[in-house]
């Protein structure tokens, strides 16, 4: 009997110690399983939709026996609605979740703490996807991932389409519990991030300016970044002793920026610009930075986005401004068919300290397209150039430390006689890109693709009611306007791809009530107006077309092609042909080959972002090959206020337009803070003859080209030092 009791007690102890596998079906069961979990347990989330859930984990595992919380099938546990994941325990692994069709509000989607007192340590999130999981409104800021604690890892995850304000991934160093953290961010796929039209669109930020003197020791290794165009900084380092190694940056309009903090390493990375405008590399600020053994391939960024930027500093700078670059090493890098690097960048009335004690050696510049390899904006005597090789085709006189030589043509990656460096080579690009791409992200979620699989239908619409019906279905639609007059009692809401067209033989009359807009471009709206003669005499809507005033995070596009607009009049109620409300962003606005005749209203207004924080309403604006005749009102007003230097836009092209007898009480074209404008090959005749034709205003560096225009009996150009005039004719 004693033996039986002993054996039973022993078996009972074994059962207590043996790890459990628990399947949970809802958040209540998960909370209970988390509460009772012990080291080595596995909690399986049943496949299906988990909507409006806060998953909070504070269980305790061990180094040998982690607590695993995993999807029954990776990608089949859908976290939707207002949902988030909080991890505040020890040795926890989360595996296989899919965040989609939802948002997290002010919180991060994934946070490595359950509350302020319970931080994650030695925890891991893997094989997980966050896809387009944005707050509905663009200005409602949050992160997708925030790191706290120490020794946490994020690996083999995929992140695509963050659109609202806020850094995608932030490493927080707000107290000692999260400093010298040795976090690992590795083998992840960071996919498309569209231009945010604001600061704060980074993919990864390590630290904040107020914590920049602390060591973070975060490792960002072997990740794949693709089309990360949110702002000038893809990775923003604002702390000390971090490393960025073995990553691929493919066609990203930005750079790895060592913004604050010292002794960071950027090594063995591939920056594959592939001739994309704005594709950058590395920007260096502060002390003791190392940039070595990187490949910069066809990176075509300029200024702050140059392939390599060494900044000027501010005298007696606080750590939170621009500390002088000192004791840096720029070594063993290859620049292949890149735009010029930038030395002493940012030189202005404040940033007057050039770099000092910078070792710049054994770098290779292969270039057959450009005449120069670097721009210099201040004294470079503090940069020590040694053993750098440059293609002999470069015509720029070079300082000592650069040798022009015959470098072999890089047209065959398999050749053995091409440029080589120890550990990195242009030859390795296809191999490295393929390997890092294949090993990044999840294996169950398709990486970002530009192709569209949505069905598109074409239908004739005789009345407004028929149009409303087509706008309510999910399919993309081509609406053929077969009627002559459309009576509108509510706006056409465009939240998908919609094309309106006609045969252009007869005028189309839109008759509206006193509504806000006839067309409202909502999130994901792509509106095409094609070959329509529009009579606006009976349009009482304040705006013929506008963006949605709710400021959604999803972008929109507008294209007007081969249309005519006539008889729009503010006296009838229509103030603007197009009006952009605050906070929403268009990827592109294209106005091509149209006629605007006898209208008495404003045309294209994008001037609501008056907070002067660098916000604006459209990344690219193209107005070309149009005829403007007998117009009353401002033609174009674009506003981007403030002194922020982190964006590429707005970018305006205004070309091959003919303007006759166009007048307004304000300038016809008003450009405030536009980063790039090209106004060329236009003909202005009797346009604002006694006033201002075009007005430029800029607080930060901009590039304005005014070229090959003809001005006859037209107003003056109020320009600044950023405007370049070439071959214009003024009569």
Where are these regions (language model features)?
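Bacterial Sec-dependent N-terminal signal peptides
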Residues: 1-21
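Flexible, charged surface loops at secondary-structure boundaries
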Residues: 35-39, 61-63, 87-88, 147, ...
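Short coil/turn segments at beta-strand junctions that form active-site/ligand-binding loops
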Residues: 39-41, 65, 278, 356, ...
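Right-handed parallel beta-helix/beta-spiral solenoid domain characteristic of secreted/periplasmic
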Residues: 21-25, 47-53, 57-109, 132-134, ...
């Amino acid at each position: 009997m004693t033996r039986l009791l002993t054996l039973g007690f022993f078996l009972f102890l074994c059962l207590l110690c043996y790890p459990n596998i628990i399947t949970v079906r809802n958040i209540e069961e998960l909370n209970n399983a988390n509460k009772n979990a012990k080291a080595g347990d596995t909690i399986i989330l049943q496949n299906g939709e988990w909507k409006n859930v806060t998953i909070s984990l504070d269980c305790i595992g061990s180094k040998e026996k982690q607590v695993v919380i995993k999807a029954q099938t990776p990608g089949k546990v859908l976290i939707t609605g207002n949902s988030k994941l909080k991890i505040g325990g020890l040795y926890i692994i989360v595996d296989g979740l899919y965040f989609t069709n939802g948002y997290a509000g002010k919180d991060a989607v994934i946070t490595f703490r359950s509350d302020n007192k319970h931080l994650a340590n030695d925890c891991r999130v893997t094989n997980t996807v966050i896809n387009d999981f944005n707050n509905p409104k663009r200005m409602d800021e949050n992160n997708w991932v925030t790191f706290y604690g120490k020794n946490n890892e994020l690996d083999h995850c995929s992140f695509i389409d963050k659109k609202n304000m806020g850094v995608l991934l932030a490493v927080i160093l707000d107290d000692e519990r999260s400093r010298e953290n040795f976090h690992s961010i590795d083998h992840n796929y960071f996919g498309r991030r569209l231009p945010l039209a604001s600061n704060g669109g980074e993919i990864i930020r390590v630290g904040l300016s107020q914590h920049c003197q602390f060591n973070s020791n975060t490792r960002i290794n072997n990740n794949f970044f693709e089309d990360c165009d949110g702002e000038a900084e893809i990775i923003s380092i604002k702390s000390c002793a971090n490393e960025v190694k073995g990553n691929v940056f493919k066609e990203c309009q930005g750079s790895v920026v060592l913004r604050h903090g010292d002794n960071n390493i950027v090594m063995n990375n591939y920056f594959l610009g592939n001739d994309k405008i704005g594709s950058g590399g590395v920007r260096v600020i502060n002390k003791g930075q190392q940039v070595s053994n990187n490949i910069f391939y066809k990176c075509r960024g300029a200024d702050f986005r140059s392939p390599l930027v060494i900044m000027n500093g501010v005298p007696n700078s606080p750590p939170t401004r621009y500390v002088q670059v000192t004791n840096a090493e720029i070594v063993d890098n290859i620049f292949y068919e890149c735009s010029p690097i930038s030395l002493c960048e940012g030189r202005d009335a404040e940033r007057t300290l050039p770099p000092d004690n910078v070792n710049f050696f054994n770098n290779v510049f292969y270039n057959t397209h450009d005449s120069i390899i670097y721009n210099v904006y201040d004294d470079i005597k503090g940069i020590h150039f040694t053993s750098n090789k440059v293609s002999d085709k470069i015509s720029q006189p070079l300082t000592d430390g650069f040798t022009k030589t015959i470098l072999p043509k890089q047209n065959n990656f398999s050749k053995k006689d091409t440029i080589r460096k120890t550990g990195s080579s242009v030859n390795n690009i296809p191999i490295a890109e393929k390997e890092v791409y294949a090993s990044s992200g999840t294996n169950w979620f398709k990486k970002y693709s530009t192709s569209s699989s949505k069905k598109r239908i074409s239908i004739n619409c005789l009345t407004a009611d028929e149009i409303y019906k087509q706008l309510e279905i999910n399919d993309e639609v081509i609406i053929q306007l077969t009627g002559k007059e459309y009576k509108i009692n509510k706006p056409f809401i465009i939240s998908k791809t919609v094309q309106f067209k006609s045969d252009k033989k007869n005028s189309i009359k839109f008759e509206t009530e006193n509504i806000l807009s006839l067309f409202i471009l909502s999130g994901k709206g792509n509106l095409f107006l094609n070959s329509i003669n529009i009579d606006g005499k009976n349009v009482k809507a304040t705006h013929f077309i506008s963006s949605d005033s709710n400021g959604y995070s999803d972008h929109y596009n507008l294209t007007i092609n081969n249309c005519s607009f006539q008889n729009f009049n503010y006296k009838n109620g229509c103030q603007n042909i197009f009006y952009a409300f605050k906070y929403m962003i268009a990827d592109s606005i294209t106005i091509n080959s149209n006629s605007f005749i006898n209208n008495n209203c404003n045309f294209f207004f994008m001037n609501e972002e008056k907070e002067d924080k660098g916000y604006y309403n459209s990344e690219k604006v193209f107005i070309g090959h149009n005829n403007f005749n007998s117009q009353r009102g401002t033609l174009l007003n674009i506003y981007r206020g403030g002194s922020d230097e982190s964006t590429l836009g707005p970018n305006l092209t205004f070309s091959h337009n003919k303007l006759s007898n166009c007048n307004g009480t304000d300038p016809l074209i008003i450009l405030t803070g536009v980063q790039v404008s090209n106004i060329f090959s236009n003909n202005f005749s009797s346009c604002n003859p006694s006033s201002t034709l075009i007005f430029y205003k800029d607080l930060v560096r901009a590039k304005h080209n005014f070229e090959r225009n003809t001005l006859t009996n037209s107003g003056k150009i109020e320009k600044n030092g950023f405007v370049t005039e070439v071959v214009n004719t003024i009569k």
